[in-house]
Amino acid sequence: MDPAAAADVLHRTLKDPKRPITVADASVESGLPLRDAEAGLTWLTSEYRGHLRVTEDGDLVHLFAHGFEKL
C-alpha cells in the first residue's frame, strides 16, 4: 500500500491521535498490516510534525502533540 493511502486510513481510524501510539497499536486499531501501519505513521509524522520517542520499556512510539493539525 502507498504510504499516503496508509496514512489516510490511520488518519480516519485512530481514536486519539494525541496519545502515544506504537506501530503495533496503529495496526490493530486500523486493521492495516504492520508494514503499512509503519509506512503510514512515518508519513503522518512527517506531515504533521510528529515525533518519535522511546519509552522506558524500550518501545518506539509516535507522538502527535497537536493531533492531526498543521501548524
Each predicted region: which residue ranges?
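A composition-biased, non-transmembrane "mature-region" signal
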Residues: 1-71
